[in-house]
Amino acid sequence: ADPDDAYENRIHIPNADRHLAAWPKDAATFRKSFAGADLNLAYGSSKRTYYDLFTPQGGIEAACGLAAFVHGGYWLALSKDDFSHMAAGLLARGWAVAILSYTLAPQARITQITREISTAVEHLGKTGTGPLRLIGHSAGGHLVSRMMCDDINFGPVTTQRLDRVLSVSGLHDLRPLQRLAKNELWQLDENESQAESPLLRTPRPGIDLVCLAGADERPEFIRQNAILPLVWQGLGANCHSQLLAGHNHFTIIETMTRADSRLCELVDCPLS
């Protein structure tokens, strides 16, 4: 089998380019029309270590919690500015939502990107009140899963608040990615691909994990979605995987815009 094709989404998704073209436009429209937007807040000192904060009526203190979204794009593409509208569903449920950017490869190795996201999460732990929950899509699913691993340390406030992670179409074992043409840009070697794979790490207690993927995704993404909970359950973590019928790699994350979506429920509601 062709390893590049196994991890290729665009050519296998109907109207894929239409989705990708719509996201920045819909995001810009949302930013202009939404009153409770605080844009381009710094969490680090690099050019892309910024986030946008969207708060429901009553402001951050009235929110029932803070959800942070980490975008995908294979650690190579996209930014927070493509995903602002994804805050809509959780805002309607009373959550504040932070949408993050981070330094992309090849300017940063994946190890550095992980460090940036941990800095962002620690910063957000001091923002608002109530639970802190992380949502990541694709490469972002990898990054939020890494925040559960026991080599990532947060201060007491963030540790107390961070209670759930949702990895949507996430990549949890990076070793196969060494075989991809894109690895010219990532520069993953055996050491880094092992160290950066949540699958090969130990989960910290006290954080629930849901891995969610579309039933119409590429088989390799469905496999990556299933493997992390299978391994981490054996290490005592409260985690499970789900497939969402009728959804592919792009449509699944678009359900974040709808308050009644399964994705928003999994962020907001008690897990059975």
Spell out what each predicted region is:
Residues 2, 6-59:
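N-terminal cap/lid segment of alpha/beta-hydrolase-fold proteins
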Residues 78-87, 98-133, 258:
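Catalytic nucleophile-loop/oxyanion-hole region of alpha/beta-hydrolase
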